[in-house]
């Protein structure tokens, strides 16, 4: 969510943050940030999400924009996982082969890592993009994941995607099992 009336940041609410008052800055590498001092926040429901007054959000007379996503069986999945700090990393079940995955460490300062199968069609996925940076893709042996038929697996102990921390993720399906004509 972002105020279009000022130059504030993009703020992210995610089901995987530790409390409803914690938000993530899409333009920064910072860990989750407590925004309870800026007004009340609550977890989004199926029909409602709320904002507080962080960076002008919720201010009367301002124009806002928000992108709202939720898990849809066989199409998209959003959640969190605990990294295992091992090169044989965490496996995250999505129910489909991913087309695009984002991962963000919420316990420590790290980038928003994004992998997709449009630019890299085979494993390991090692051409990430960073949502919080303006540069393009780069080759990275330290931020590799594998796209599997039913989810994705981290193939590194790098703290940005699989250290001993909590991570939020979002994934969209390539050829979802339930809706095989999605993409």
Where are these regions (language model features)?
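Surface-exposed molecular-recognition determinants
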Residues: 1-183
């Amino acid at each position: 969510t972002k105020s279009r009336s000022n130059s504030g940041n993009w703020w992210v609410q995610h089901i995987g943050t530790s409390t409803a008052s914690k938000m993530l800055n899409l333009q920064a590498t910072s860990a989750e940030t407590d925004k309870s001092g800026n007004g009340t926040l609550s977890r989004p429901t199926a029909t409602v999400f709320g904002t507080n007054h962080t960076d002008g959000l919720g201010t009367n007379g301002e124009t806002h924009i928000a992108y709202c996503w939720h898990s849809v069986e066989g199409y998209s999945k959003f959640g969190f996982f605990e990294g295992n700090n091992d090169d044989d990393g965490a496996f995250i079940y999505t129910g489909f082969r991913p087309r695009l995955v984002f991962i963000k460490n919420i316990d420590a300062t790290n980038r928003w890592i994004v992998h997709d199968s449009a630019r890299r069609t085979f494993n390991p996925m090692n051409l990430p993009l960073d949502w919080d940076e303006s540069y393009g893709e780069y080759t990275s042996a330290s931020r590799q994941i594998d796209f599997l038929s039913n989810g994705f697996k981290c193939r590194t102990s790098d703290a940005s995607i699989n250290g001993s921390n909590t991570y939020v993720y979002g994934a969209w399906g390539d050829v979802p099992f339930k809706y095989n004509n999605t993409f």
